[in-house]
């Protein structure tokens, strides 16, 4: 379908009908197949939240470029962006950080709290998956573990190896704090 759309005037991509455009398609024989099975893009919303409208726009652009896999990075040390109903603190606590790293030395932040309400409900996640599927795009939602879990550990410190205290990271890089694989509560958390 995208190859056919590309043969039509650019107005095919507009949201409103265009009446002053000639919708003519040249006679053609199309032999079009992807070279690679996996043609994807990655979007990191754990560190910077975009919201539903932008994610759908991203998927629209992916469709135009015949990409078929959306790798959606939803959790990391800097923020938790997906609702898990059994663990509400993941979003009420884990989505919030006290600032964002803005300098190359990684030790200074802008001091501006970030993340209030910046997460997706399960219904919104389903909506994005359905929207993507209608465009022939598979969604790979990423939840990092056992590392890159400071947002989760801030919400549930008992899941860590040290018990904390933890805070949602305002830096970039790799934290030493991870989920404790030897902790039975951690295993229950992962199963849920």
Model regions and ranges:
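Feature activates predominantly on carbohydrate-active enzymes
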Residues: 1-177, 181-192
């Amino acid at each position: 379908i995208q190859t056919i759309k590309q043969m039509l005037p650019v107005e095919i991509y507009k949201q409103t009908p265009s009446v002053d455009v000639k919708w003519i398609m040249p006679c053609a024989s199309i032999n079009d197949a992807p070279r690679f099975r996996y043609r994807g893009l990655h979007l990191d919303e754990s560190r910077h939240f975009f919201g539903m409208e932008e994610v759908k726009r991203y998927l629209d652009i992916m469709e135009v470029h015949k990409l078929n896999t959306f790798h959606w990075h939803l959790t990391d040390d800097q923020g938790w962006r997906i609702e898990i109903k059994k663990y509400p603190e993941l979003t009420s606590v884990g989505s919030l950080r006290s600032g964002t790293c803005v300098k190359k030395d990684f030790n200074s932040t802008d001091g501006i709290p970030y993340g209030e309400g910046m997460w997706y409900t399960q219904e919104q996640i389903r909506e994005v998956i359905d929207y993507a599927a209608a465009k022939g795009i598979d969604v790979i939602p990423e939840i990092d573990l056992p590392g890159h879990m400071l947002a989760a550990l801030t919400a549930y410190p008992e899941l860590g190896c040290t018990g904390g205290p933890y805070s949602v990271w305002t830096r970039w890089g790799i934290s030493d704090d991870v989920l404790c694989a030897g902790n039975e509560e951690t295993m229950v958390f992962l199963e849920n």
